Amino acid sequence: MPARHYSLRDIALSRLNITDLPLNGLKRVERQRLGDERGFLSRLFCAEELSAAGWQKPIAQINHTHTTRCGTVRGLHFQYPPHAEIKLVSCIRGEVWDVAVDLRRDSTTFLHWHAERLSENNCRAL
């Protein structure tokens, strides 16, 4: 049986599964993998799907961080309005324990937190 190779149509049909989480405004984005004997492909970003799920701002930047030692703590990301940014955090190699804390005083989930393991294998982002 010949190997299956994925077409541009298959790639276009790859979807992001977007789920609301207990923190107000926090979402889990799970990428669908399309794979064959060569490896896999997954959609990292789709403006249309994210917009339909409530993504309100355009992407301002994309960063890549490399951590050399296990157990490293990176820090807390927070900006006061009007400089607040929407972040999409994922892990492309290894794994990370990602924790989100709601620091917005006017939020119904103020001081609540949510944590998930993000990894190269589960294709999740928060």
Where are these regions (language model features)?
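Short, intrinsically disordered, charge-balanced linker/junction segments flanking boundaries
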Residues: 124-126
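Non-catalytic, conserved peripheral segments adjacent to functional cores
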Residues: 2-121
